Amino acid sequence: RGDSYQLSKMAAENSECRWIVFCGVHFMAETADILANRPEKVAQRDGRRVEVILPDMAAGCSMADMAAIEQVEAAWEDLAEVVDTDEITPITYINSAASLKAFCGRHGGVVCTSSNAAGVLQWAFERRRRVLFFPDQHLGRNTALTMDITNDQMPVWDPYAHELGGNDSQAIQQGRVILWKGHCSVHQMFQPGHVHQLREQYPDIQILVHPECPQEANDLA
């Protein structure tokens, strides 16, 4: 029992495990495969890999699908035209394809979860000036706002825009966190009106909001 990362860790740490049946979406099964079959784990099993089975191959995550590796690689090349990409740390939310995690690894980046996003951003800024955060703009924005980074320092990169993700070069050069235009289709639905409605019905209620929700709902909660 746990979130997808915790479940993957539990399966990977089980030395007797031979198969993992992950009743979830693609990125969850990929994460389990990465953790269970990293080189040191395979060596401990004398070269045997753990097979990961996804019962429904059509099970996907709309947010993970909003950032394709080809789009991210193209964005990186475009960014290189206006800033030094050696000053950018790519960060991908764990809710993303394995190809994006590999991209981060190739470029000195990292994978984060919703619970450690603040620590990961802090780690990144201790090393480089900027961050490219994908695929969830809300998690990136809500986390960065707690670190005194303002919205005007967080340009949103639209992979379908014609040039620089819909930004001018000045916005990119002044940016600290470049946010990918992606979101969770479910968390996106929670709006300030829901918070107001609950507070009217239950004046003393404590409202917990996930950082994948829009900033406006997070701020009110």
Pin down the residues of each PLM region.
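The feature marks the mature, well-folded catalytic cores of soluble enzymes
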Residues: 1-221
